[in-house]
From Swiss-Prot:
Family in the record: Belongs to the CRELD family.
UniProt-annotated glycosylation sites, renumbered to this chain: 249
Stated name of the protein: Protein disulfide isomerase Creld2
Record text on subunit structure and interactions: Interacts with CHRNA4. Component of a complex containing at least CRELD2, MANF, MATN3 and PDIA4.
Keywords assigned by UniProt, alphabetized: Calcium, Disulfide bond, EGF-like domain, Endoplasmic reticulum, Glycoprotein, Isomerase, Redox-active center, Repeat, Signal
Domain EGF-like: 134-176, 288-329
One GO cellular component, as annotated: Golgi apparatus
Length: 350
């Protein structure tokens, strides 16, 4: 029973935590390319080394040159895979003899290790500009796939269908045509350069707003150019009550009025059409009414204190007084002396 529990616990440790996204397993081509990149880096790191025995002339005469030696190959191979990288070590173990054969007898005839090992020997990858199981040429040819204006699906791998995924501004099976919002700056049978239209154009023949064939939404043709439509100048505002309209190129935005406004024409209390209760227009903008300073008392009960707050006021009995229906009545303990004056309530208590 204990063994079963231990096995189950070990299995749980191997499972990814809840919500974790499993990393995509590298393809055989990616694994091969990584191995070759590390091999080439190992060759660069050992390029200036020798046997290190102190008698280089004797060593090279007796053991052959370090440059082509098995000792150098061993040093390179030892640095190819981290001990924890199972897939790399598995690939290296399976293909160790192939790498040794290339090092010993094939390197001069096939100096490009990636092409010899990954493309022709393992058949895991294709050369750039080709794709699929048989390494066919990408659309537009292997030299400039997709006319240089896109990516070939599966380029350099044994996968994909060779179709073009065009860069922004380009379309068509060879990425040679321009999409809406772009115009042809330069074009021949194999090359195409598409450049962006002015922002006012949906389609165009050149870079300015006078070159528009169709105006973009939010723009209108005036004489020979597309110009911005000011939606905020319409007789009826496109915004709801409590908002004002701001025009932007090709569109508009609705912004909230200041909190003191009932309707507004722009930002801030100076642009209110009317003021909310408790505020009045003063020097062109809505300001708080101090009800406590008005000639007519705001607080009606006897002994009651008035405190102004933004947009309103509060009536509070002083310390030492208690509320009744029509007055603030002093309690026996609440007699006020000059040494013990009443204090106004804090802002938090209002």
């Amino acid at each position: 029973m204990h063994l079963l529990l231990a096995a189950a616990f070990g299995l749980l440790l191997l499972l990814p935590p809840p919500g974790a996204v499993a990393s995509r397993k590298p393809t055989m081509c990616q694994r091969c390319r990584t191995l070759v990149d590390k091999f080439n880096q190992g060759m660069a790191n050992t390029a200036r080394k020798n046997f290190g025995g102190g008698n280089t002339a004797w060593e090279e005469k007796t053991l052959s040159k370090y440059e082509f030696s098995e000792i150098r190959l061993l040093e390179i191979m030892e640095g190819l895979c981290d001990s924890s990288d199972f897939e790399c070590n598995q690939l290296l173990e399976q293909q160790e003899e192939q790498l040794e054969a290339w090092w010993q007898t094939l390197k001069k005839e096939h100096p490009n290790l990636f092409e010899w090992f990954c493309v022709h020997t393992l058949k895991a990858c294709c050369l750039p500009g080709t794709y699929g199981p048989d390494c066919q040429e990408c659309q537009g040819g292997s030299e400039r796939p997709c006319s240089g204006n896109g990516y070939c699906s599966g380029d350099g791998s044994r996968q994909g269908d060779g179709s073009c995924q065009c860069h922004t501004g380009y379309k068509g099976p060879l990425c040679i045509d321009c999409t809406d919002g772009f115009f042809s700056l330069q074009r021949n049978e194999t090359h195409s350069i598409c450049s962006a239209c002015d922002e006012s154009c949906k389609t165009c023949s050149g870079p300015s707003n006078k070159d528009c064939i169709q105006c973009e939404v939010g723009w209108a043709r005036v004489e020979d150019a597309c110009v911005d439509v000011d939606e905020c100048a319409a007789e009826t505002s496109p915004c709801s009550d409590g908002q004002y309209c701001e025009n932007v190129n090709g569109s508009y935005t609705c912004e909230d009025c200041d909190s003191t406004c009932v309707g507004c024409t722009g930002k801030g209390p100076a642009n209110c059409k009317e003021c909310i209760a408790g505020y009045t227009k003063e020097s062109g903008q809505c300001t708080d009414i101090d009800e406590c300073s008005l000639e007519e008392k705001a607080c009606k009960r006897k002994n009651e204190n008035c405190y102004n707050v933004p947009g309103s006021f509060v009536c509070v009995c002083p310390e030492g007084f208690e509320e009744t229906e029509d007055a603030c009545v002093q309690t026996a303990e609440g007699k006020v002396t000059e040494e013990n004056p009443t204090q106004p309530p804090s802002r938090e208590d209002l």
